[in-house]
Amino acid sequence: MAKNQNQGQIAEHSARRYLEQRGLTFVEQNVRYRFGEIDIVMKDGSDWVFVEVKYRSPSQYGGAVNALSQAQTLRIRKAASHYIQINRIDAICRFDVVAVDPDAMQWIRDAF
């Protein structure tokens, strides 16, 4: 397994635990479609939460919170839309980002 892929999996696991400790309920992880991927699907009460986890090492410019491009958000929205449709979800949904840096974790609700 590549080092970056392993770090990404560790970051996703840490983000999941972090959100569960804050009251969210885990539903599914690494949901992949040909046009996009959802890192983590969770529920916050009756609301559905699609979580993008971003990891950056300290040497990478801008940190994890700045690592999400407009093209990436579009792919995530597309994947979430498909997920909502195939699972017949009729509830409030939001997109959160958990930015994981080696020294800190930042949870951004309604990030995009």
Curated annotation (Swiss-Prot):
GO molecular-function term, one example from the UniProt record: nucleic acid binding
SUPFAM superfamilies, sorted: Restriction endonuclease-like
InterPro entries xrefs: Restrct_endonuc-II-like, tRNA_endonuc-like_dom_sf, UPF0102_YraN-like
Disulphide-bonded residues: none
Similarity comment text for this entry: Belongs to the UPF0102 family.
Alphabetized PANTHER family for the sequence: UPF0102 PROTEIN YRAN
NCBIfam families per record: PRK12497.1-3, YraN family protein
HAMAP family assigned to the protein according to its UniProt record, in alphabetical order: UPF0102 (MF_00048)
Protein name in the entry: UPF0102 protein Spea_0251
